[in-house]
Amino acid sequence: MKNKTRVSEYYLPLMKNVSGEVKLRSHKYSLRAGLVKQCGAGLYSWLPLGLKVLRNIESVIRQELDSMGMHEMLMPCIQLAKLWEESGRYSDYGKELLKFKDRHDNELLFGPTNEEVITAIVRDDLASYKQLPKILYHIQWKFRDEIRPRFGLMRAREFLMKDAYSFDVDQQSARISYNKVYQSYLRIFKRLGLNPIPCRANAGVIGGSLNHEFHITTTEGGEGKIFYPEEMGELVDEFCKIDPSNEHAVSVMTEKLQELFCFTEECNSSGIGNDNRICTAQGIEVGHIFLFGEKYSAPMQARFSGRDGKKKNFYMGSYGIGISRLLAAIIEVHSDDKGIIWPESIAPFKIGLINLHGESCGFAEEIFSKLDSVIYDDTADSQGVKFARMDLIGVPFQIIVGKNGPIHGTIELKYRLDSKRESRSLNELVSLFSHT
């Protein structure tokens, strides 16, 4: 299906100004560029442009996880309270957990996470060690009743999450699964145009003996300081190139990264002293992974038959990426004073076609017909408005058709990232964008 539209036909409600209470750049641009519309405190409707980006992020995540042998499923938003009572976690979330009853007086909740549900599912289906290991994931909307939702999509009450859960026979096997997800996260974030920093962190209410947060660095909009060695970026790039099927190489590299000094501010108990090899930056958390063993399988009696015929508890891990939050983080990193600059991998449209002269309409239509992933500004607005619109919504490339375009057969190509401009023929453009 062709991904192309005209501005005159598209639902693209842009805003010139936003409330003075809007502080983060991602919050401002998600509203101004017509990605979302706020419906209430911490609640947003996703408009066509924003939904396209959200789906493109999902696609990158699915490609990486599927390539690693993980299996997608879908669990419900609404969960039974009795499952959380089984795990002993029902009271841990406090007022952030939205609780209610149905007409039959059954206690329910709007799930903020899915450890209990997935454990209840597999305890009925995975009966033998021969069926392990398994990693299952889903992408679903979650709800946490934040006392003070703020910063737009960065801390909304309703949010889209990718959750994955691993089931293994023992700790050694579980570490292999953990390392596999660890690498897949680095690959995902790199494909999204980000530089991830995996940091040791607190496990919180999820629990577990081993966990890492994945942060991206930013000059604005950070949640707190992170500390990491200056060689971290090179090591992450090297790790992403390792064949995921090479379990030994993946494990060795994971251990190497985890031995480095990478901490969030709250976990930096040892201090960094005067070591100038340690970098300090503002970080935004975009993912969190946990290895928690039998924390849920033991109280919920989720067991399998081991090689010796004895019943054993699953050794489990949990792995999350906040997808809607990730979109906001990408805007924080990839934007300027004119608007968003989407990485090509997730842009809603790769090309913004701008016709500057009425006499060039026929030529512009010909260009539009031969390209894909394009939004064509066919309105009668001024040149300044058209350029500002394309800069704001962040399409990576702008094709500009002037008065002399049809005469000389040349078209101006502008790169949103650095505003570089160059002249191209239509055939050159078709060839260029058929390979991107």
UniProtKB/Swiss-Prot annotation:
Keywords: Aminoacyl-tRNA synthetase, ATP-binding, Cytoplasm, Ligase, Nucleotide-binding, Protein biosynthesis. Signal peptide: none annotated. This is Proline--tRNA ligase. GO terms for biological process: prolyl-tRNA aminoacylation. Its EC number is 6.1.1.15. Its main location: cytoplasm. InterPro entries: aa-tRNA-synt_IIb, aa-tRNA-synth_II, aa-tRNA-synth_II/BPL/LPL, Anticodon-bd, Anticodon-bd_dom_sf, Pro-tRNA-ligase_IIa, Pro-tRNA_synthetase, Prolyl-tRNA_ligase_IIa_type2. It comes from the Bacteria. It comes from Neorickettsia sennetsu (strain ATCC VR-367 / Miyayama) (Ehrlichia sennetsu). The gene is proS.
